[in-house]
Regions:
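Sec-dependent, cleavable N-terminal signal peptides
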Residues: 1-8
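C-terminal His-loop and adjacent cap/lid subdomain of alpha/beta-hydrolase
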Residues: 9-293, 297-597
Length: 597
């Protein structure tokens, strides 16, 4: 009787490590190939589009193969891994295939058609003039060191050890010279920065972690909210002692600053591409923590909800839930202009009554919205200096120019009104009874209530105040929900650890008020409850100015513990269940009133 044929080996597994297979960028991708036994690994063949690339792979301690594939042209490529039989009588090999799609390093991946014109700022950022129309510039590597007196200073020669060089001990117990490698360049038309401890003389490698890197990444986001059409010069900041001293690498890009780009879709894309480049340079990060305040918090909330996997945990500060439901911004403009008008003055409003009608603890907060951000709903008011006057919209002299409103940044998602070219707006105050709660409580008179609502007005398509109320474009409302511009909290945010770390500024000097009012933290909490039945994945920290530093340290420390527990949990359950059951038992809402308590 003939011997039975040997059983076929299980097929290898091909995994893109640096990004999702459909979102490869820049012509390279870090790939892992796993086999089910080391015998198969010794007889492995790996190809890209029929080309043998096995030499690009290294065997890792767990028996898998890790390789950085380079030179991919734009478009689709097929990776094939074949575990061949090891000799006569051995089981036949099995083949695995994975298609990857490579995109230009200048983008886009998923954000849609890029804005044009787009004004480059590489020279202003110190990278030299752009090398193409997509605002590219050569990558720069420089070094900084931390002094014993607590500042970062340039280090022209990384082989030199200055007399005032500090050392630092990372969270995994390694003590290293506090030298930082700073990489700056361009990705997705943004200027990016990556900082990490690096006291070695060899370049970083995705195959071996740097001695000072703790294999974690913090991704920072900057605040504001304005129209795009330009590159920007600053990032969310990467030279941060809080992170670097503990061994975290830090990354960010200029399109992760909301004042440069008030679109979390573009921000998410830039973050994904920068993170891909980071992993291909340093290796896979165990997890990535989002960090940043105000508009930076909006980006974290929306990216975590709509693009899960880019950020594993988030630490929003001065937080807001999203930008489109900040209806108080245009409302505060209407109220401020009314109170300063003859009708408002004649109605005799006191400071207390203005606050009561606005719903804020002080009307100063509402007035700050009017002064600082309400212009972002007006196509004529808020153009950044990077956009030349000749390129800006004017209804008569340049009707096809750049409309400098925040709605313009999400026009790809909202669509445009073909009659006038403006993005469909969800802006609406039809039926709003300003000051109703104040009237019901007796804080204002009926005459004041009527005067306010008769004279509040609304906005025309340009964003200028008019006597009539404004009705939302139904298409704009529908698409705001459909495309995730309104943060329900029911998607990826439900399975994201959140530590909301707020410095209390509701009545802060010098204005006696602030736009970053505390209740927005609880708006996020309620949305999580409404969408998921629980908000156990969110913790709220709050501090006064003297306790803010201690609060930030605690937020990072607690987020690290939370993510480490999730990372180690391989028990059954959904992602949301793993987040909640691994929340540290002693982690709860807390406040700080001093650097120590």
């Amino acid at each position: 009787m003939a011997a039975p044929a040997p059983a076929a080996r299980a097929a290898p597994e091909i995994i893109t490590v640096s990004t999702r297979a459909e979102y490869v960028s820049g012509g390279d991708v870090l790939v892992e190939v796993r086999t089910h036994d080391r015998g198969a690994a010794r007889h492995l063949r790996i190809e890209v589009d029929g080309r043998d690339v096995l030499s690009s792979f290294r065997e890792m301690p767990d028996g898998s193969r890790l390789g950085l594939l380079t030179g991919l042209s734009v478009g689709s490529h097929t990776i094939v891994a074949r575990a061949n039989g090891s000799g006569k009588g051995s089981p036949p090999g099995r083949t695995a295939r994975l298609d990857v799609v490579n995109h230009p390093i200048t983008g886009p991946l998923f954000s849609g058609p890029q804005q044009h014109p787009f004004f480059c700022e590489t020279a202003q950022a110190g990278l030299g003039p752009p090398t193409d129309a997509a605002c590219s510039a050569p990558t720069q590597i420089s070094y900084r060191y931390r002094t014993t007196s607590g500042s970062f200073q340039p280090l022209a020669d990384p082989t030199v050890r200055p007399a005032d060089l500090a050392q630092t001990t990372t969270i995994d117990g390694r003590t290293v010279d506090y030298i930082v490698r700073l990489e700056r360049g361009t990705i997705d038309r943004a200027i990016y920065e990556i900082a990490a401890l690096d006291d070695s003389l060899s370049p970083p490698s995705p195959f071996t972690a740097e001695p000072g890197w703790n294999e974690r990444l913090v991704y920072t986001f900057g605040g504001g909210c304005n129209v795009g059409y330009h590159q920007g010069t600053g990032t969310g900041g990467v030279l941060n002692d809080l992170f670097l001293s503990r061994g975290y690498a830090v990354a960010s890009a200029s399109l992760n600053v909301y004042e440069t780009n008030c679109s979390e879709v573009i921000s998410a894309e830039a973050a994904l591409m920068v993170k891909e480049h980071f992993i291909e340079t340093y290796g896979a990060a165990r997890y990535t923590i989002g960090w940043g305040g105000s508009g930076g918090a909006i980006q974290q909330h929306l990216i975590a909800n709509n693009y899960p996997g880019i950020l594993d945990g988030i630490v929003p500060a001065a937080s807001f839930q999203d930008s489109l439901t900040l209806g108080t911004v245009p409302d505060c403009r209407l109220l401020a202009l009314y109170f300063a008008s003859p009708a408002g003055i004649a109605a005799g409003w006191t400071a207390e009554q203005r606050a009561a009608a606005s719903g804020y603890g002080t009307f100063n907060s509402c007035n700050l919205w009017h002064l600082a951000f309400a212009s972002r709903t007006n196509a004529l008011e808020a153009c950044p200096n990077a956009i030349p006057v000749s390129a800006r919209y004017h209804p008569v002299t340049n009707p096809t120019g750049i409309r400098c409103t925040s709605f313009e940044q999400i026009a790809t998602q909202l669509g445009r009104n073909p009659a006038n070219g403006f993005a469909w707006r969800p802006l609406d105050n039809i039926g709003v009874e300003y000051g109703l709660t104040a009237l019901q409580s007796g804080a204002i008179t009926a005459e004041q209530f009527v005067s306010l609502n008769e004279n509040a007005g609304g906005f025309d398509v340009i964003g200028q105040v008019i006597p009539e109320r404004v009705a939302a474009d139904p298409i704009g409302v529908q698409r705001s929900y459909q495309t995730g511009r309104l943060n329900t909290g029911g998607l990826g945010l439900a399975s994201t650890p959140i530590i909301d770390a707020r410095t209390y500024t509701d009545f802060a000097p010098p204005f006696g008020g602030d736009i970053h009012t505390r209740f927005h933290s609880f708006v996020v909490r309620q949305r999580l409850r409404d969408a998921n039945g629980t908000a156990a994945n969110q913790v709220i920290f709050i501090a006064n100015s003297s306790g803010s530093g201690a609060m930030q340290i605690e937020a990072l420390t607690r987020m690290e513990a939370w993510l480490a527990a999730i990372h180690a949990d391989d028990a059954p359950g959904s992602a949301a269940e793993r987040v909640i059951r691994n929340r540290p038992a002693n982690l709860s809402d807390a406040c700080w009133t001093s650097p120590t308590t």
